[in-house]
From Swiss-Prot:
Residue ranges, compositional bias (Basic residues): 187-202
Keywords assigned: Ion transport, Membrane, Metal-binding, Transmembrane, Transmembrane helix, Transport, Vacuole, Zinc, Zinc transport
Protein name as annotated: Metal tolerance protein 1
Location of region: Disordered: 186-232
Vacuolar face of the membrane: 78-89, 144-159, 285-290
UniProt key word rRNA-binding: no
SUPFAM superfamilies given in the database record: Cation efflux protein cytoplasmic domain-like (SSF160240), Cation efflux protein transmembrane domain-like (SSF161111)
InterPro entries: Cation_efflux, Cation_efflux_CTD_sf, Cation_efflux_TMD_sf, CDF/SLC30A
Expression across tissues: Ubiquitously expressed at low levels.
């Protein structure tokens, strides 16, 4: 028996007897000292700096939202305006969305553990589910109160205070739009390519190959983010170099997705604040038109619920382990079958641990004369380049 142990890999070769009837070669790679999960704690200092900047901006956005939400709750009660309270409920949904984005960035630095081998990203989904239930409860209470007021017609609304609070909200939203929009508008300007392979974060390869006298061979590959390729020839190097720029660009867009989502939330809030201002101005002008406040309440309640639909859909799809909507599994399989060395693809599974953290596993049958290592890297390169799935497990079969 011969063994070789590089820093992050372990290779064992076993020869049975004096013949080559059976040979087992196992190569494995783990992230750090723990089972590999989705921890990005090994990322370069540039990535850590960018993540820190994004977290700082989202923290400021959360604080501003909480301050303004408190002002709206107090102002809504004093003005007796359900529209303002509904806007406060909408702000709560934004706070939840910002907090989830913030947690996502924070958890990116957590280490996976032997028990939590995928890390702690699923907490993000559970937190989002709880926050949505709270938002639906508050919105339901406000809609019920609006209907009661429409029926009884006993409430009085302070239009001036309603207008003032909404105007303050518009100012806060503009500040947040400038804060978040700066990064949104410049997210494309800081990409650098490096020619050193150890900078390419495409996770490793685990290959298990069995050679029997029945000429039956299996290969397993496991990839997820930090690839130090000790290449199997020039073809592998060319494949990885070819897609490096494209993958880097996609990763850059992915890192900015949280701030872009927050930016869109703020734009929606600004429109709603303008609506409340108009309603407040109408009631300020003519207090008898207080029904405008109730109309705004019902309309904004629909908006609040509408903003959570996409959220709840994503949550259910993750919990059901559905194939993410942005990935066409049929097209992906077809792309693999178009490779001349590939005969068949089966047991194809694509799912997500949380939104944006996608995994893929499948079995790939190849031609008897094909080079298993070359096909392995070719398949992984295709999946990373075309679908930006960095956590990949492939089993090669003949």
């Amino acid at each position: 028996m011969e063994s070789s142990s590089p820093h992050h890999s372990h290779i064992v070769e076993v020869n049975v007897g004096k013949s080559d009837e059976e040979r087992i070669i196992v190569a494995s790679k783990v992230c750090g000292e723990a089972p590999c999960g989705f921890s990005d704690s090994k990322n370069a200092s540039g990535d850590a700096h960018e993540r820190s900047a994004s977290m700082r901006k989202l923290c400021i956005a959360v604080v501003l939202c909480l301050v303004f939400m408190s002002v709206e709750v107090v102002g809504g009660i004093k003005a007796n305006s359900l529209a303002i309270l509904t806007d406060a409920a909408h702000l709560l949904s934004d706070v939840a969305a910002f907090a989830i984005s913030l947690f996502s960035l924070w958890a990116a630095g957590w280490e996976a553990t032997p028990r939590q081998t995928y890390g702690f990203f699923r907490i993000e989904i559970l937190g989002a589910l709880v926050s949505i239930q709270l938002i639906w409860l508050l919105t339901g209470i406000l809609v019920y109160e609006a209907i009661i007021r429409i029926v009884t017609e006993t409430s009085e609304v302070n239009g001036f205070l309603m207008f003032l609070v909404a105007a303050f909200g518009l100012v806060v939203n503009i500040i947040m739009a400038v804060l978040l929009g700066h990064d949104h508008g410049h997210s494309h300007g800081h990409g650098h390519g490096h020619g050193h392979d150890h900078h390419n974060h495409s996770h490793g390869v685990t290959v298990t190959t069995h050679h029997h006298h029945h000429d039956h061979e299996h290969g397993h590959s496991h990839g997820h983010g930090e690839d130090k390729h000790h290449a199997h020839g020039d073809v592998t190097e060319q494949l990885l170099d070819k897609s490096k720029t494209q993958v880097a660009a996609k990763e850059k867009r992915k890192r900015n997705i949280n701030l872009q989502g927050a930016y869109l939330h703020v734009l929606g809030d600004s429109i709603q604040s303008v609506g409340v201002m108009i309603g407040g101005a109408i009631i300020w002008y003519n207090p008898e038109w207080k029904i405008v406040d109730l109309i705004c309440t019902l309309a904004f309640s629909v908006i609040v619920l509408g903003t959570t639909i996409n959220m709840i859909r994503n949550i259910l799809e993750v919990l059901m382990e559905s194939t993410p909507r942005e990935i066409d599994a049929t097209k992906l399989e077809k792309g693999l079958l178009e490779m001349e060395e590939v005969v068949a693809v089966h047991e194809l599974h694509i799912w997500a641990i949380t939104v944006g953290k996608v995994l893929l596993a499948c079995h790939v049958n190849i031609r008897p004369e094909a080079d298993a290592d070359m096909v392995l890297n070719k398949v992984i390169d295709y999946i990373r380049r075309e679908y930006n799935i960095s956590h990949v497990t492939i089993q090669i079969e003949r």
